[in-house]
A protein has these predicted regions:
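Acidic/polar active-site rim loop that often engages polyanionic ligands
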Residues: 12
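Sec-dependent signal peptide recognition
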Residues: 2-9
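Beta-strand-enriched cores of mature, soluble protein domains
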Residues: 22-162
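N-terminal signal peptide c-region/cleavage motif recognized by signal peptidases
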Residues: 15-19
Length: 162
């Protein structure tokens, strides 16, 4: 009977550890600056930019703890056309406390960009990571606001699995 109780306790402990490592959710805030370049095209314009910023997890579970800091770098492409605007960014987020990086694709088709008061909502896809974030996937919703033409603040709500 004692062995049976031990095996049940061990199973529950291992199960809870694997589900803890299997995923979770977190909310983060990221602020930073863009450097933009733009050209006209036959049906609108294309704008590209590089982003660098700093972030912090404000609420999280699993591997992402509240107070965890990050550095972000993105290459952004904005295409203005008669049907609207497509905004895409490929980003690398570095989490020094985890000695790991996370790779993301951001997409947005609504809202404004690159002027004071501009804002919009979009979707981020977590594509993978390195070291402790190897195998991570997931999605995030985000809201971004421009304080001026180059300075932004974004709020990100993510769920992930490993």
């Amino acid at each position: 009977m004692l062995i049976k109780k031990f095996l049940v306790a061990a199973f529950l402990c291992i199960s809870s550890m694997s589900s803890f490592a299997a995923g979770g959710s977190f909310q983060s805030v990221l602020t930073g600056n863009f450097e933009w370049k733009s050209i006209d095209t036959v049906d609108g314009s294309v704008m590209s930019g590089a982003f660098q910023g700093l972030g912090m997890v404000v609420e999280g579970d699993g591997i992402f703890n509240s107070g965890m800091a990050s550095r972000g770098e993105c290459l952004v492409r904005v295409r203005n056309h008669p049907g609207g605007r497509d905004i895409n960014a490929e980003c690398t987020i570095d989490y020094p406390e985890l000695d790991s990086k996370m790779f993301m694709l951001l997409e947005r088709k609504a809202g404004d960009i690159a002027n004071a008061g501009a804002k919009g909502d979009g979707v981020q896809t977590i594509l993978g990571g390195t070291n402790k974030l190897k195998g991570i996937t997931g999605t995030c919703s985000y809201s971004i606001k421009y304080l001026d033409a180059v300075t932004t603040v974004s709020n990100n709500n993510c769920s992930y699995s490993m």
